[in-house]
Amino acid sequence: MKIGIFDSGIGGLSVLHQAMITMPEADYIFYADVDNVPYGEKTREEVRKLVDHAVGFLVDKGCQAIVLACNTATSAAISYLREKYKLPIIGIEPAVKPAVEHTSETGRRVMVVSTPVTAKGEKLKRLIDKYDDKHVVDVVALPKLVRFAQDDDFDSSDVTDYLKCEFAPYNLNDYSELVLGCTHFNYFKDSFAKLFPDDLEMVDGNTGVSNNLKNTVMKKGIFTEKDKGKKGSVEYYYSDRKMESEAEMKHIKKLHERLERMRQI
């Protein structure tokens, strides 16, 4: 069973990381379009074209299901891709529903942080319209955070100063929920935790999309008896280039280690 996981950059490793925990039997191909990151500052048409190329690449590699581990790509391209390709394509979306539901206990607000494309997109608007009947959700675009992540700059003073500047119009004590609406943002949970109240709950779509992936491949018969108990594998591609050198794999290992630390926050 071969599964493709796509993102504009290294953010999607957080989805891969969770998928490997949820379904360790799978053989994964992770594709990060690092030559064209960040997607959140491009037009929807540009994003759609880039994602179409990456999905075609994964299909050619024999993937039987594909996860768009990118909120921006999901928002801009998933409907088009599902019409074009016959295999299951699973998207990720900001976890607005559980965050809003939790505010019934806390009586406070929800902040959704995302890229500009996701923030302005119809998909997020529909989610908020559907679940935010008490109007407790605020959306903040953090485009530079993707660039920080791609530069391995996770906890510098530049990151802290940027977040403080973007959050300056808001009283952060008003928020009990922070929805991470971009997979790159999982690398910065420690930075968010320093700025928000101690009881802040950070939610992302990683567990939900991993469970959805598992349910889909079981239902479609992609996961078969021969996959049970099997030890899976991972191949990594950066914009069509396979990552194989010792230095490249060492760097990817470090990113997984950071994501595991952030998962514990």
UniProtKB/Swiss-Prot annotation:
It catalyses: L-glutamate = D-glutamate. The keyword Nucleotidyltransferase does not apply. GO terms for molecular function: glutamate racemase activity. The active site is at 70 (proton donor/acceptor), 182 (proton donor/acceptor). Substrate binds at residues 7-8, 39-40, 71-72, 183-184. Belongs to the aspartate/glutamate racemases family. This is Glutamate racemase. It comes from Lachnospira eligens (strain ATCC 27750 / DSM 3376 / VPI C15-48 / C15-B4). The gene is murI.
